[in-house]
């Protein structure tokens, strides 16, 4: 039998086992703090709108939860992504037994979490460099007023235009943005 093969292992059971020299720091993206091991695991369980096709030459981006590559404005500052309907989260008690579909607002919330001072994310710099309008101000307000981060406050930098459409507005042109 090949190394790692379990005798009597059934095809229905799908388990991925990875060995790391240290435990992961978190499964929560804003709290991984650039932990390579945690990020390796997260890449297996979270899906971004786009993913790399590493086998293509040259390497290219392909839609993952998006239906296509984003529409990019002429000035290179606005990216509009349409999500594929019918993608559901894995069952979780948080969903109270109901199926939960992935929607654009989920990505808005996920990005905003990096700005929430409660998480003190060391990966925030990756978003700060994009200068997403409104997000730094929202963070600053939460810090200055010592109040919880306002997830309900709409900002120009990241918005759900409808159930399946996500718009990201950069504060300055960045041709590498979709490759990050």
Q: What does each of the following model-derived ranges do?
A:
Residues 10, 71-77, 158-165:
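Short, ordered beta-strand-loop transition motifs
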Residues 13-23, 78-81, 107, 166-168:
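Short, well-ordered beta-strand elements
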């Amino acid at each position: 039998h090949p190394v790692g093969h379990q005798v009597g292992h059934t095809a229905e059971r799908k388990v991925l086992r990875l060995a790391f020299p240290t435990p992961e720091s978190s499964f929560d993206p804003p709290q991984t703090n650039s932990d390579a091991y945690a990020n390796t695991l997260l890449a297996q369980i979270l899906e971004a709108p786009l993913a790399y096709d590493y086998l293509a030459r040259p390497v290219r981006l392909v839609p993952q939860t998006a239906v296509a590559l984003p529409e990019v404005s002429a000035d290179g500052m606005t990216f509009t992504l349409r999500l594929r309907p019918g993608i559901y989260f894995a069952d979780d008690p948080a969903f109270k037994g109901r199926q939960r579909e992935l929607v654009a607002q989920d990505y808005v919330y996920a990005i905003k979490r990096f700005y929430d001072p409660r998480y003190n994310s060391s990966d925030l710099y990756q978003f700060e460099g994009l200068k997403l309008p409104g997000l730094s101000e929202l963070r600053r307000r939460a810090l200055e007023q010592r109040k919880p981060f306002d997830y309900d406050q709409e900002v120009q930098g990241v918005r759900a235009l409808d159930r399946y459409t996500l718009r990201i507005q950069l504060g300055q042109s960045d041709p590498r943005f979709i490759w990050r």
